[in-house]
Amino acid sequence: MRLEQPRNSLKRSTLDLIERVNRDEYPSLPQDSKCKDALVSAFRKTANFKKYNRPDVNSREQLISPSLTEEDLLGRIRQRYKEKIFAGGQEKFADQSFIAEQIASTYEDFKDNPTLPAYCGEMTYLLYYHLREEGIKPENMLVVGFSANAEDHVLLMYSSDEGFLEQIKNDYFEQEEEGEEAESYKNFIELCARRDKNQTLLLLDPWSQDNKILDLNQLDRDESTNEVIEDYFKNKREALEEGFQPHAIIDGVLEESRVSKATGSVINMETLSFQVDAFKPEELMEIDEENTSDSSEEGTSKNRFRDTLFSNVPDSSSDSENEQEREKKELAGKTPSFRLC
């Protein structure tokens, strides 16, 4: 059985985006021609990926058109992805460039398949990878995650000012160190509002059908940055409730009290960074095909870390009381949180 072709709407939305970029509808891009050309090329390369939710999310598409072929392919990609990530666990924190390269390499292994299922996190890192190939420096990009109750979403920030993204990371983690709670979109919006109006600042969302690029310099003078961004994400959440509920593959890493209880809902990372304080590098390097399979012996730190990274099921060693309290807060409508991924 052949995989079904990508959604025409996804391809069409990408082509529409490229046309808008070429028509200079995004005011920042004409003055940043390198970024403009890189975006056109990178988005074109993501057009053939098939939007897909994690297996534990009962999306509308999965309920209507299940495909064992797709599930099998997805499982193979997950396995290869896990092997590559663990094989590189030599540093305390994995940086965004490394993660992007591993994901791109995994998908290259399956390039003969016309459509590959991809989560929003994968699509974002693939876009990051292709932008790097086009000459955009890692210092100009930052992958961030948003969480609305149990729903996570990942997108990419681009700034022509390297210091601005560094400031976002430093300011946000400084807030965490002072014991303040990570604030929904509020913290993110306030940080974006501080920007130098002469810089190019874009939110890039390859998963989105209608809002793949949000140019913050596109705002009218009588509109505040806060209002526009709040409206953007508000509309996005409403749309997700009617259709997809995208989750990043890195959801497990970002969930508070699963890998790092010290930093709340934020784990210090260059983008996808996961803390491995409790896991020795040599242990990570020992993970092979046998002990990363579903039949692996449970209860080891390696398996717990693996399950944390790739499963939405809480780790059995986690503090169940804290986990229940966290879930109650989320279900009660806790304001979505912004996190550096």
Swiss-Prot record:
Function as written in the Swiss-Prot or TrEMBL entry: May be involved in the pathogenesis of acute Q fever.
Subcellular location: Cytoplasm
Primary localisation category: cytoplasm
Lineage: superkingdom: Bacteria
Compositional bias of kind Acidic residues: 287-297
Protein name as annotated: Protein CbhE
UniProt lineage: Bacteria, Pseudomonadati, Pseudomonadota, Gammaproteobacteria, Legionellales
Any one of the GO CC terms: cytoplasm
Record keywords: Cytoplasm, Plasmid
The organism of origin for this protein: Coxiella burnetii (strain RSA 493 / Nine Mile phase I)
Annotated stretches, region: Disordered: 287-341
Keyword RNA-binding: no
Biased composition (Basic and acidic residues): 323-332
